[in-house]
């Protein structure tokens, strides 16, 4: 399994997915985590799993459809380029199944690690 991680360590509001990545990797050595730039092309697996900052949520949450981010959303992907690229891949038919593990920008580090870990492998 591969999980893509989006984020920008230079922007505080978008840095948490990158900051927690070493701990998540330690918890799940059998999973391949890859930091990706939303503006680059990526191989799209049958099920694309992404960890990214999501504005407008108070807790770590899983999204299984891009419809939650379209129009005038109640929540929005922090990085518009990620959303635009994902919609493009969906339109091309290359995006079959998606899971976005949304991380609020201001959640506590340890809480984020715990919540994401529980979503990756629920107990």
Language-model features, listed with the residues they occupy:
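N-terminal catalytic or cofactor-binding beta/alpha core of small enzyme domains
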Residues: 1-123
């Amino acid at each position: 399994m591969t999980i893509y991680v989006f984020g920008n360590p230079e922007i505080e509001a978008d840095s948490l997915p990158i900051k927690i990545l070493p701990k998540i990797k330690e918890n799940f050595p059998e999973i391949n985590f890859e930091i990706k730039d939303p503006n680059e092309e990526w191989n799209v697996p049958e099920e694309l799993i992404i960890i990214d900052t999501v504005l407008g949520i108070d807790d770590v949450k899983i999204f299984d459809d891009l419809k939650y981010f379209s129009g005038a959303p109640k929540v929005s992907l922090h990085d518009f380029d990620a959303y635009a690229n994902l919609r493009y891949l969906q339109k091309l038919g290359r995006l079959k199944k998606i899971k976005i593990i949304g991380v609020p920008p201001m959640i506590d580090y340890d809480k984020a690690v715990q919540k994401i870990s529980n979503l990756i492998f629920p107990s």
